[in-house]
Amino acid sequence: MDLEPWGPLYRKQDQDGSLDNIAVVSGDIPSPHPKNEPSQTSTLHIPRDSDLDSDIPSVPTALIIAWGLTLSSLTGDEVVGFDLLPFRGDYQDLGARPYHFLLKFGYREWSREAATTGMDLGSASSEGLPQGMGNRPQIAPSRFRNVLIIKQCSDAPGDSGSLESPSLGNVDKDEPTDAFRADMFISIQCGIGRTGIDVHCSFDPAFWTSENIRMILLDLSRNFKEVMRCGRDDTPLTCLEGMSPKGLDCVLRRNIIPPPPKMEACVHHRFQARCRQNPSALAIDAWDGQLTYAELDSLSSQLASRLVSSITICPRGFMGVLMEKSAWVPVAILAVLKVGSAFVFLDGSQPLQRLKIICAETKSQLVLSSAHYREKANTLGPPVLLVEKNQSGLGQAKENDSCPSLLEDYPQPQSQPQDTLYAVFTSGSTGEPKGAMVDHGAFCTMCGPQMAARPTTNVSPRVFQFAPHAFTVSILDYLGTLLQGGCVCVPSEEELRNNMAGAIEGLSANIVTMTPSMARVLDPTQTPSLQLVLLAGEMMAQCDLDKWSQCVRLLSLYGQSENAAGSMISEKSIVPRAPNTFETLTPGFQCWIVSQDNPHRLMALGEVGELLLEGPALGQGYMNDPIQTEDKFICRSFCLEYAHSGSPQSYRLFKTGDLVRYTPAGEIELLGRKGAEVKLRGQRIDLTEIEHHLRCLFPSATRVVADVIIPSDDIDGLHPVLAAFVQVDSVSRTGQSAEATFASPRPEFRAEAKAVLSGLCQTIPSYMIPMTIIPTEAFPFTATGKLDRRSLRQYASAMSRSDLLKYVTDDRGPVVTAVTPVEIIIHDACVEALGVSSDKVGMLDSFPDLGGDSLAARRMVSICRTKGLELAVADILAHSSLTSLAEKCSAGGGGAKQISQGVEMLDPFSTAKEEFLSHLPSFLPNADMIADVFPVQGAQRRAARAIDTFIFRLSGPVDADRLRDACQVLQQAHLALRSIFVPFYGKFMQVVLRVPPLDFTRRLLPDGTDLVKWAESIGQADKTQRPPSEEFVVRFTLAETAGTPDYSIFMMRLSHAQYDAGCLARIISDLWAVYEQKQLVVKSDFAQYARRAVQQTHLLSMEAFWRDLLAGTTGLTPLPVTGISAEEERTIIVQQRVELKEPPPTGISMATVVRGAWSWVLHQQTGNTVVVFNEMLNGRDVVPLEDTEPVVGACHSIVPVCVHFPLPQSGRTPRELLSALQEQHLASLTFTTLDRDYLIQNCTEWTSHQSGFILAYQNFPEICDLVIGEDLSCQWASQVLDLAEPGEAWVTATPLPGALQISLRVSTAAMDEQEANAWISALGQTIIRFLDSPDSVL
């Protein structure tokens, strides 16, 4: 037989002849297993035929090649390694040590002519080889240790002699390997005899089953025959199509259950069926509101009506949804579906150019946008329709600030199950994102079986909506949960960034799907409400199992954008399993493992191949890309014709690009991805898209490569980074090399690399932007001339994170160590979040320059929180160094919580409390009545005598006893609501009663009584005849008339020292939640808030800030004086609605716009060169507490704002004025807990406590209309407030959709109604001017 094509390659090993002369040895061979190590054997006989007769000396050569091919199929590698034992007749002289071989296969492109360059048998040797035979390489491609033994037998026919395994001598059995464990040992012993070849395999049963080994031997036999045929017939050596019948039966048994038929249903129809089953069940529980199934159905129908009336809808077209996480996202989705369209999520965090491409690809007819993204939506091209919340708490669509009434009746198109439901855009190879489409029927088919695998324990599913809108899981969170009758729990974007654990607990979520990277950020002990955690999007690690499997039910989910929901799922809590194995197929799929290069060839058990999915839940394909759709979605596979013989139906198949294999236990093990697609922190990235944009920005580059690497100092290997490699003329080296060579960092290249990274930010999402760009002198290539990505990754991974960053960041100074307690916490958290060694992080480094991204910042926030330090993601990413971040914390920013916890045991009120308890007032007979005592602080003191009344309309029957019980529970739950305010030696003390009295009255009024006016009169009487503050003022009243039993009024009277506008909505919602027999969860109370605020006040240096700000001032800007008598004085209120056409300038809040406009009006109206006024702020923003819900209590503070006129040269435009005020506001936030009286006495030269104007920007939670049960609703009716003190004037601004409501409450002793209207009009005009012309000269 002529095997000449392989001859020259073998001769690289030995110059004196062919391998045929050295690959055969006679004699007995001892066993390879160390003493006492268990092993099992399996045998196979390859019978003698014409091949063996033709060229017996070449048989050993063919066996070596066949074993290499078998290993390549088993591992999926083109480079495989094994030990060949023994080699010559002088075997004993070699000390029984094997030759180590590396076979480099190019067999996927093999032909007889290419074979000489497609293999290289001479690239490795063991240490026992004679000199000149080559050196062992630095990296061993063997995925498990294995040895091939070939022996010529001269025994009787059919007897190959004693084929026991040889001794391995001192071969290092624990040598590190590429992916598999080193002790996964196999020994293949081939005895060439007269009747054929007897193959004996010794293997470790701990890692291999007999069935797996049997399949391996069958592969070896088939490969051997194919190699012999190739040499004999002078034909190409192909990919060896075909499988033995036994092997095929084993594979088919893995898919014995066929997928179900495709469901003929539409998503919105199934949702409406859910609504009919349980209309009052809670569907959405979001940070901005709650919706029942009936409300969600009604609101989406209203919005659908608006869509129909706004544009001419093209049937089965697309509409974009550009909204932050909100209760209104599912309203928008369902509205789009109800008008017969499909939707595509537009993630507002992605670059504008990418969103424009998505809109163009989908030919979006309309973009449904929130007010937050209105400006961005208007630049995308399609018409924009705003979806937002109106004052009454219902949803409405709004276009061009016009709000026509919405009707639920509209022409409904006949949607079909085969219609597209949604499109999801992922990274694409052409430089632009590719859109995968899924139809209604596919989603409905998977939704039932898929969600059935996500049960909780004895409670209704409450699914936490974590995934960004750009990813498929977010659609499963919304629609999948709704179709199952569960509740979608929607956090705010800010909560996700800074306190995800708090958001989960605040919403009482019990299910979440997230990436393993995100799961590593959370602490299971901080999320006790979670019962089921699904990890998806990337490979799990053992640490993920160790962390979560004992705390929750842990599932691993596998799926892709090209199919609905997931296709494989694995239980990780009940049965111990490897992290990346899947034992269960979801009922909508069958899985097949095929050759990476030939989808028509099935792989045997244990062999590595590409995963193919088959089933009714596959998507429709790629939008506007028939070529790629045809490539990835296979209509027919020859290898499955036998599998489907007699089957009633078969489906298309999808080539996933994921490399997998069957484990010995029969599970599917996920090994990685083939080609240029990678997974990084749950994001699927096509590297060629990044390379496309790099080429555009690096025109001088001759070669550009992007890949994922693991820095050498990544301790646990869980923090891979994306790196780019560019070869430019200035650093290139001619010719091809087997090694990668990188240039040194230079300032010129660093500047160019920074510019390129900045340019990438404008075109691709942040998760696709490389952390570094490395100038590469030479790229490594394989023997076949291909780019060797594996070697490139390995060479780059030899660099540390700091080495990689030197190419894109300025030269690093000395590593400065942490000194203070706060610095040590920040330093250690940064080290842990980035997964680097401690000496790599210095306090002068910035977090982004260390390679930190937003996910790592979240991890750092979580770590700091466990150590008592509160930080925000934005702070971590914004600060120029860890030192400046620590200084901010030490100055009272995020570090306030950590510092105060250090003295948590020292109660700042202990002295005052002891003094009060030792001198109890007579109306408090004993201390047992008292739960707590502490001094009233700041703005709360001025509100201790104010009595406010709130009035609500109730429609429907009310159970008065249940309402009375609910009032009692509410009062007991919130500490502030069981407090009285007692004068004590010139100050007020807040006394918390253990069991307060319940003042609940039910009034039956004469028919015809105007209940609202009656309630207002009661409130006015309470305001005029204020009860003493030491009396318990909380009172609840239910009033009704005999003639209208289903209509009543509910009144609630509170002291303004017990609440503020920031918690009023919570008080109302908690009351009716208790009425519906729901359990209240109160994690933080007002006593904790008061103590924490005082601790910050005493620990932080506040006085210097206020002294500097108020230096030279003599007091608040005084109110004007009209001169009327006290008898004629009255309070007037004027207000105006300001329509807003432009958003605030970048970086400026709307509150700052109002603040700046009011300071300008004061300057213009009074002519004062210095204006000083008070502003009411929400103290909850600066006092960290555990509860994500607003603490019930008077947490507001009143602080001065000071502006000097005329403005300096650098501040003569509105933009500059607003920037200065924004900086003043941000700087003052950490100092707002200082008591106002103390501030005036110790930080100013003011002679008296003057009154003046108080500005309040009332961006507080809205009191929404509530639906209680099936037939009771609660609506806001009126209020009677007791706010102003003599000499005060209140200026308020309340944000509305597209507008501001501004008002002025002032005494006629300061101005008459005409003057008040002039002032408020001036404020409105100034706000518009500042927004429309921020760069005009003042």
From Swiss-Prot:
EC numbers listed for it are: 6.3.2.-
Residue positions, PTM O-(pantetheine 4'-phosphoryl)serine? S854
The catalytic activity, as recorded, is: 7beta,14,16-trihydroxyconfertifolin + benzoate + H(+) = dideacetyl astellolide A + H2O; 7beta,14,16-trihydroxyconfertifolin + 4-hydroxybenzoate + H(+) = dideacetyl astellolide B + H2O
Write down the SUPFAM superfamilies for this protein, in alphabetical order: Acetyl-CoA synthetase-like, ACP-like, CoA-dependent acyltransferases
InterPro entries associated with the record: ACP-like_sf, AMP-bd_C_sf, AMP-dep_synth/lig_dom, ANL_N_sf, CAT-like_dom_sf, Condensatn, PP-bd_ACP
Name of this chain's protein: Nonribosomal peptide synthetase astA
Task: Tell me the domain of life.
Answer: Eukaryota
Instruction: Specify where the region named Condensation lies, as residue ranges.
Output: 949-1336
Q: In which pathway does it act?
A: Secondary metabolite biosynthesis; terpenoid biosynthesis
Region Disordered: list its residue ranges: 22-52
- Free-text note regarding domains: NRP synthetases are composed of discrete domains (adenylation (A), thiolation (T) or peptidyl carrier protein (PCP) and condensation (C) domains) which when grouped together are referred to as a single module. Each module is responsible for the recognition (via the A domain) and incorporation of a single amino acid into the growing peptide product. Thus, an NRP synthetase is generally composed of one or more modules and can terminate in a thioesterase domain (TE) that releases the newly synthesized peptide from the enzyme.
Gene3D superfamilies in UniProt: 3.30.300.30, ACP-like (1.10.1200.10), Chloramphenicol acetyltransferase-like domain (3.30.559.10), N-terminal domain of ligase-like (3.40.50.12780), Nonribosomal peptide synthetase, condensation domain (3.30.559.30)
- An example molecular function term from Gene Ontology annotations: ligase activity
What does this protein's UniProt record list under function?
A: Nonribosomal peptide synthetase; part of the gene cluster that mediates the biosynthesis of astellolides, drimane-type sesquiterpene esters that show antimicrobial, anti-inflammatory, and anti-tumor activities. The first step in astellolide biosynthesis is performed by the sesquiterpene cyclase astC that catalyzes the formation of drimanyl pyrophosphate from farnesyl pyrophosphate. Drimanyl pyrophosphate is then dephosphorylated by the sesquiterpene phosphatase astI to produce drimanyl monophosphate which is further dephosphorylated to drim-8-ene-11-ol by atsK.
Q: What induces it?
A: Expression is regulated by the secondary metabolite regulator cclA.
Q: Deletion: any effect?
A: Impairs the production of deacetyl astellolides A and B and leads to the accumulation of trihydroxy confertifolin.
Query: Among the entry's GO cellular component annotations, what is one?
Result: cytoplasm
At the top of the EC hierarchy, this enzyme's class is: ligase
Residue ranges of every copy of the Carrier domain listed in the record: 820-893
Q: Which GO terms describe its biological process?
A: amino acid activation for nonribosomal peptide biosynthetic process; secondary metabolite biosynthetic process; terpenoid biosynthetic process
